A protein has these predicted regions:
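Hydrophobic ligand-binding cavity/cleft-lining segments
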Residues: 1-41, 48
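Intrinsic-disorder/low-complexity, polar/charged segments enriched in Ser/Thr/Lys/Arg/Asp/Glu/Gln
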Residues: 3-9, 52, 66, 79, ...
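Solvent-exposed residues in well-ordered beta-strands and their adjoining turns
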Residues: 9-13, 56, 113-115, 124-128
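A solvent-exposed, acidic/Ser-Thr-rich amphipathic alpha-helical stretch
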Residues: 42-53, 62
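Hydrophobic-ligand binding "helix-grip"
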Residues: 46, 60-115
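Short beta-strand segments that buttress and anchor functional surface loops
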Residues: 52-60, 82-84, 123-125
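Short, solvent-exposed aromatic-acidic interface loops
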Residues: 85-90, 124-130
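A conserved amphipathic terminal alpha-helix motif
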Residues: 101-104, 120, 126-152
Length: 152
């Protein structure tokens, strides 16, 4: 697994950015910025520490797929740590086997820093070799979309 890092500065208070990124006041804000990964991107579950959460979308065949994850840490307005430990395929959760093993135990962490009303988000994530290029191309665009949402 490769460690990747992305960041963006957003001219909005950290509370607004955190709530929009996680879709806490409206899931639509989460779905809007993550639509760059999958136009039907959403989540089922809770952002509470220790909770299971599914990051899901529908593929071109109309089948639901995505990732099975756990919120390892959530310090409101400061830090969120997500551990991916399975996948959703054809609407079924798979948490073991060769497909899962290559990227299971990967983390995706969000750090929020306030600097005089400007919020910096730092995203640290683990990616398998076959996803590095995709993440390097897509994650910055998704963070720019989040910036656009928060600065409205």
């Amino acid at each position: 697994m490769k460690k990747l890092q992305f960041n963006v500065k957003i001219n909005a208070p950290v509370s607004k950015v955190y709530e929009a990124m996680l879709g806490l006041k409206s899931k639509l804000t989460y779905e809007e910025w993550t639509s760059l990964f999958n136009p039907t991107s959403t989540y089922d579950g809770s952002w509470n520490k220790g909770s299971k959460i599914l990051f899901i979308g529908t593929d071109e065949k109309g089948e639901r797929g995505g990732m099975v994850s756990e919120i390892v840490e959530n310090i409101p307005y400061q830090y969120v740590s997500i551990r991916h430990y399975g996948l959703v395929k054809d609407d079924k959760e798979i948490t073991e086997g060769p497909e899962v093993e290559k990227w299971a135990r990967g983390f995706e962490n969000y750090s929020f820093k306030d600097n005089n009303g400007i919020t910096e988000i730092i995203v640290d994530l683990d990616a398998t070799d076959d996803f590095v290029e995709y993440m390097n191309q897509t994650f910055p665009k998704a963070l720019e979309k989040l910036k656009e949402i928060c600065e409205k």
